[in-house]
A protein has these predicted regions:
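Short amphipathic, positively biased membrane-proximal segments
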Residues: 1-200
Length: 200
């Protein structure tokens, strides 16, 4: 969330500009230029935010840089950074007013749990030695999305759903070779929207 006195509109405009550039480069396969745009995403978004939100975004920024690489070590580093980021988001989201939606309407969690179970069942035989790290990561991701839903704020809940979408697209591509046309563009479009909505 914005802190009082934050840069507000200018920071939001800067993030939108960097995000639009990176999504365009991702969709057109210009990986080299993305070494300039992708590392700027989270540092731009965290300007003027509260401390807990900044921590979650900073961990996302570490993951962004790690995943510019293509080695197994880069993937592991990115996975670890984003897992820590999801845990940080859970802490940040719990401080927001209006939480408690799931206590009143627990059935709202069912689609999230079904998506988590279905994706893991599909990926389990395909992830090899990564299956336990992927399971741990997906559990943290689902918990973060449910925490976002529990705030009772539609935009925040949408951010959680979009993050689920982002990482589902990534997992299906990496482990099952399932991808959309301009796949990386869709991944980044959902990702930058997710982080922006969670941070708003």
């Amino acid at each position: 969330m914005w802190q009082p006195g934050g840069m507000g509109e200018r920071a939001a405009a800067a993030y939108l500009a960097v995000a639009a550039a990176d999504v365009t480069l991702a969709a057109t396969g210009r990986r080299g230029l993305r070494r300039l745009t992708k590392p700027l995403l989270m540092p731009t978004l965290l300007i003027g935010r509260d401390r807990l939100t900044q921590r979650a975004l900073a961990l996302g920024g570490v993951g962004d840089v790690a995943l510019l690489g293509s080695s197994p070590a880069a993937f592991t580093a990115g996975l670890g950074a984003f897992l820590a980021g999801h845990l940080a988001w859970i802490q940040a989201l719990r401080t927001r007013q209006g939480s408690g939606l799931l206590r009143r309407h627990p059935a709202l969690a069912l689609p999230y749990l079904a998506a988590w179970a279905g994706l893991n069942a599909y990926l389990w035989p395909r992830t090899g030695r990564d299956r336990y790290p992927v399971l741990a990561y997906s559990t943290a991701l689902a918990a973060m999305a449910l925490t976002a839903l529990d705030t009772g704020k539609p935009a925040t809940a949408a951010g959680g759903v979009l993050f689920l979408t982002t990482d589902s697209l990534l997992a299906l591509d990496r482990f099952a070779r399932v991808e959309l046309p301009r796949h990386e563009g869709w991944v980044m479009a959902t990702y930058v929207a997710a982080q922006g909505l969670l941070a708003a």
